[in-house]
Design a protein with these regions (language model features):
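Intrinsically disordered, metal-sensing/regulatory segments
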Residues: 1-258
Length: 258
């Protein structure tokens, strides 16, 4: 039951964030969007380092001087995997008027939801890998560290849920449809977590590769989506400040609970 709840925690963060559409004005201000994107980016970077890359390297210490190898390979596979999905799936980032991926007749709303859904895949995989490692009895991964990652992703997903539902509302969608769009973008997380856990049961020896794969995919999202989003418009430091807030919060959470 604890593992089931741990898998659902990130999805709950997205759902609560999407619910902001019922309580806030029709659109988010530029400074608020920058702050939310910066905060989410900071959480993702810290979680990728402390919860994924460092455990991946520690689990490969028996390789001696080459203990970096699984983390290096998994990281690059994660980056290339997201790069491939970016080219295969039509999507539109929030705040952008130019669609990415193959040409499509999908409307703006659908492509905006697809963009967030696409980049939520690594979140579910990260949680699934952590709980798979815990179930396998991996000494570097405890129930507390897996929970810390779930909580961190949920904290990050709250602003991301608002970032998708509020623009959908601004696009002319009803509050209910905007909320559902935000919720649907996060459904892939528990699904991805469960599928990753099932797969990991059969390939535990490559757990370090899976951990670093999730890290590479997450950092791809930060650089490709969140950093540009927090830097849009006139120069401002608010995105950078909230990046630092998110990073330090996730660092404390991971170390304190891990």
């Amino acid at each position: 039951m604890k593992i089931f709840l741990g898998i659902l925690i990130p999805f709950a963060g997205t759902t609560f964030g999407a619910a902001c559409v019922f309580f806030m004005k029709k659109s988010l201000g530029r400074s608020v969007q920058r702050s939310l994107a910066g905060f989410a980016a900071g959480v993702m970077v810290a979680a990728s380092i402390w919860s994924l890359l460092i455990p991946a390297i520690e689990q490969s210490k028996n390789m001696g001087a080459f203990s970096f190898f699984p983390a290096f390979v998994g990281f690059w596979i994660g980056v290339l995997f997201l790069l491939l999905l970016d080219h295969l799936i039509p999507h539109l980032h929030v705040g952008s008027n130019q669609a990415e991926g193959p040409k499509s007749k999908l409307n703006r709303t659908t492509m905006m939801v697809l963009a967030v859904t696409l980049h939520n895949i690594p979140e579910g995989m990260a949680v699934g890998v952590m709980y798979a490692g815990f179930l396998a009895g991996n000494v570097q991964i405890t129930a507390a560290s897996a929970l810390a990652l779930s909580l961190g992703i949920a904290i990050q997903n709250f602003p991301e849920g608002a970032i998708i539902s509020m623009p959908l509302r601004a696009e002319g969608e009803s509050k209910k449809r905007a909320f559902l769009g935000g919720v649907l973008s996060g459904v892939v997380e528990p699904i991805g977590a469960v599928l990753t856990m099932i797969a990991a049961q059969f390939i535990i020896p490559v757990l370090p590769y899976l951990l670093s794969f999730a890290a590479g995919a997450r950092l791809y999202v930060v650089v490709e989506e969140l950093i540009p989003e927090m830097s849009q418009g006139e120069h401002s430091n608010i995105g950078t400040v909230f990046f630092a807030v998110g990073f330090s919060l996730m660092m404390v959470l991971d170390v304190a609970l891990g």
